[in-house]
Every structure is written in C-alpha cells, then in structure tokens.
Amino acid sequence: MSAAKKGMKKSTYLIIWTLVIALLCSAVGVVNYEALYWDSALTLYFGEVGVKNVSTVTFDTDDHAQVANLIVAEGAVLLKNEKNALPMKGGKISLFGIDNKSGVLQKVLEDEGFTVNPTLAAFYAASSHSSGAGSLSAGNGSETGGWVIDEVPQSEYTADVKASYKDYNDAAVVVLMRTGAEGNDLPYDMSRYGGSADENYLELNKDEKELLAEVHKAFDKVIVLISSANAMQMDFVDKAEYGIDAVLWYARPAGGIGSIAKILSGAINPSGRLVDTYVHDNMSSAAMQNFGDYRYVNEDGTLSGYSYVNYAEGIYVGYKYYETRYEDAVLKQGNAGDYDYAATVAYPFGYGLSYTDFEWSDLKVDWDGDLCTASVTVKNTGFTSGKDVVEFYVQSPYIPGGVEKAAVSLAQYVKTAELAPGESQRVSVTFSKQDIASYDAKDAKTYVIDAGDWYVTAAHDAHEAVNNVLAAKGKTTADGMTANGNTAMAAKYTVSERELLNKDAVSGAEVTNQLDDIVYADDTVYLSRSDWSVMDNNGLEYATGVAKGVSNVGNISGDAPTYVISDDLRAKFELKGFAASLNPTDPTDAPDPSRYPHHGTKPRPSS
C-alpha cells in the first residue's frame, strides 16, 4: 500500500472517530447540563446513592390525550362573554400571539371547523421571536433569563400580513401566554427581561398592549385566550381601547389543547371555575409586601447563600385576604378603611361563566354530630346543555385578638351532571368539623371550633359567598356591598361553647404544636384583620436578610431588617435526608406503619 493511501486511510479514520467523539461529548454535555440544572431536585429525589429503575410499565399515549382533553374540558374557565361572542360555529378567524408559533392551536381549530388566516400563521412561524427564551442557572431548576415575553412588535407586521385580516375577520383570537413552575419566583421587575422596572411578569407588556389595540381597530370581535398557570394581572380586560369581547382561561394544557377549540365552537360548554383570585393589580396582595430573594448574611457581612422569609401575611392569601377585608369594610371594623373591592378584584376565587343559565333553590343544611350535609337544587334555565358548580363556604366567628379567621372558607364543592335545558338535579356535599376547624397555635395549641354564629352558604364564587353571609346579617348595598346577597342561600348554626379537636381522627394521637421554635425572627409582625391599616402603612416589613445588592430584593418600602445567621441555624440548613425536615418525630414511631408505604425498611412519615 502506498504512503499516500495509508495517509488517506488514517485521515478518514481520524475524521470518523473525531465525529463520533464529538457527538458523544455533545450528548454527555447535554445530559450533564440537565443533571446540573436539576441537581438539588435529583439529589432530594434519588438521594446520594444509586437507584435502579426496574419498572417495565408502558403507557398508552392515546389514553393520556383523552385524560388531558378531559381535564381542559372540565377545567377551562370562561371569564368574560360580552354580546354572546362565544360560542362560534366555525368561521374565518385570525390567530394572534407568538405562542401560536408552533401551529398546534391552529391545527385543532381547523379540525373543529374554523378557517385560520394562513398568512398570519406563516408570519409567526417565520418570526425570530420566541416567548420564554433565556439562560438557565444550575442547581435548583430556576430560570434566570426565561422571563422574556418577546411578543412580536407591531413594527414587524408587514403590509401583506395586515391586509390578510380582512379575509379572516369573523373574529380575532389573541393568545396571551405566561410560564412559571416550582423553583421559580416570577419577576416583579422586568427591566432585565426587555421590560421596565415598574412592570411585573404577569401584566401585559408594551408589545402585547399594542397588539390588542391594533387588533381592536381591525376586528369587530376580539377573543382573548389566557394560557397561564399563574394568575395574570387583569387590568386590561375591560379597557375600551382593547375592545375585548370574550376571555377564556386555561392553564398550559399541552395535550388537552383540542378541548379549547371545542369550547370556542360550542361543542363543549365551559364549566371550570377559578382556583385563584384575579385582580387588577397583583401588587395589591398582602403577600407581595415582602416578596423577594431575602438572604441571610454571615458575621463578616457577606451573603450566606441561604434565604428565609416569615410569611407574615398569615392566612390572608388570595381570596382569604380580598374577601375578608371586603367584609370588614362593609361591617366598618378592623380599620379596613375605604377598601374598594370592585376596583381591586376583577374575578373572584371560584368564578366562571357558562353558555347557559342556572337557577338554584331549596338550600338545606343539616348537622349530625360532627358532620354537616348541605344540599341545593340546580336547574338549567337556559337554552343549551351544560354543567354547573355549587360551592359551599363556611364562615366561623372571629374574635379580635383570637385565632385569625377568613370571612369565608371553601368547605366543599360539587359539579352537576350535564343538564339539558329545563332539567334539574339535587346536589349535596358532606364535610366535618375537622374540615372547617381553625388551628390555635398560641393558646389551645390544637384545632378549635370557636363558640358563636357559624354560617354555611352555597355560592357561585367566594365573593358571592361573603355577600350571602352579609345579607344574612342584614347588610345591603346601602352599607357598601358590591351587590345584594341571597339570604335563601345562607344558613346560620350556633355553637354554644368552644370545642377542641385535639385527637387525630385516624390514629387517636394527640394533635398539638410540634414546631414552636421554627420561626427565626421573633419580632415578626403578622397581619391581623383586627387592624388592616398595618398593611397599608407598609407595616409588614418582616423579611429576614439583606435588601441591597441582591437581585429582586426588597419589600414595598424598599428595605428589610437584617439577621446574622447563627452556627446552629447554619448546621440545620446543611442537614440532608430525613433530618433536613427538622421533624421531631422519628418515622419508626408512626402509630400505624401500614399507612406509610415505602420501598425501604422504615415507614415514611406522612406529609
């Protein structure tokens, strides 16, 4: 063999193996990157020893798709429907929003009989914009740059794209998308993500506002789809410059997207209800007063790497803040002030519309020992079949200085069967005193049922529940209520003396405080409905850590007290495995080991 051929053979051999090694290195790099990205989660899940997966279970993807579509069909929430904008029986529509870049929603809409603007679809598919683009940080799955909304600016819409609107103008469907998951705090300062410092991630950015304004100019019907698992700020929904006729919410449905098309067409009548309170300004929440990345500092003033914050809003999160402060404003108590509920809340917890109408009657509430059974008759009084949801709320008596209580708490709910026009169904629920008890951490140090007047009400949402209770107390719109309540949907139950629920219903074990020393900052001021003005005066400055030099740090007033981490506390932070829970009970002491299935030799403690 000539030297030239030998050289060529060696060269070819080298090229092939170089490519193989390069591909292997690339694959290892990707896997290593993902492992590093989820390092904390993987370590917690798998531990620090090897785990062998011996499962041979397979799953039917068709079954998965059916379940996903069922979840969306039952859970998507119709928030607004002016002039019966929905449903639409087919039609020629234009689909807006960078979240449509994949073409998935377009396909299911076309499968449902809609004709979707192809020029606009091609424009998004070719766009360089992509929502959520950014870099990732290692360790805990957090995204440091993934909050770029990146909607297409109006300056990039060509004349041909805009000209296509007139041929597909039965409706404009605008998709607004937000991401977010565990391990990620959504930014309330968008200056690092293409926005401004006074914008938060869950409000519309400049490009989205301009998109809605331009769409309103070109279309008589505007439908907004909100694809977000987090509660977006809803200050835009009723603004005249956007002309929004209908709003449908769904939470990143993945394989269930087909049900969205069926809801728009009317093949499915929406029956979902909100599991959050949607407000005009997300900063109105009590929990936002100290939201941030609060870090402990070492004795030398450097950051320790550990974060901590006392949740001094206490129970007043979501509807338990908004509805409770509203009731106190109506009752003129607790320094609630001139609280304007209507200007604060766009859609209350439990809210949701239907394409038909329902009428409720004959509420019955019966107590049998520790169990309560509540029932009501639901009748479809509209012109199309649909399902309704009856939510049962409870109000427990509040004693200033005692256990904090929300104005109402959801006790149970039930969804009807598919009811044809004119059809009725009697629905009922059962709940126990344990389900509605409060925990008295200071005095009784166990669950309690306080003496006084209790109310059970059937309502469409949390706000209607409060109004029903207020009506039962003799209050009307003349007292500042947003609407008159329905006394027929509220029942009073009087407890003569306080009851302690200090025995576990299953094990019989004593129920009492276990973590009295878990709060590190003893000077924490907790929010109380006895004095709402504390929050208004930025009184909830209760975060530990430093407020300067760390991204997204600071409360409403821009500062926070600083605490130095102790050696003892640092040691607790550095614990691993079961010890890291600081659980004072050894898992082997569980009263009934059969209740705690575990692959190891010790029973796993209940969560």
Name each model feature, range by range.
Residues M1-S607:
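C-terminal non-catalytic regions of proteins with extracellular/luminal or membrane-system context
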